Amino acid sequence: MSVLVYSFASFVLGWCLRSGITYFTRLMETSS
C-alpha cells in the first residue's frame, strides 16, 4: 500500500517538476 502511494507521489512530483521546467524555459524564451 505504502509503496503504491510512494510511487504515485513520485510520479506526480516528477510530472509537476517537468511541466514547471518547460513552462519556465518557455517564459524565459518569450521574455528575452
From Swiss-Prot:
Its main location: virion. It is a single-pass membrane protein. The chain crosses the membrane at residues 2-24. GO terms for cellular component: host cell membrane; membrane; virion component. Keywords: Host membrane, Membrane, Transmembrane, Transmembrane helix, Virion. It is found in: Virion; Host membrane. Belongs to the inovirus G9P protein family. May initiate with G7P the virion concomitant assembly-budding process, by interacting with the packaging signal of the viral genome. The assembly-budding takes place at the host inner membrane. In turn, G7P and G9P are present at the end of the filamentous virion that emerges first from the bacterial host. This is Tail virion protein G9P. It comes from Enterobacteria phage M13 (Bacteriophage M13). The gene is IX.
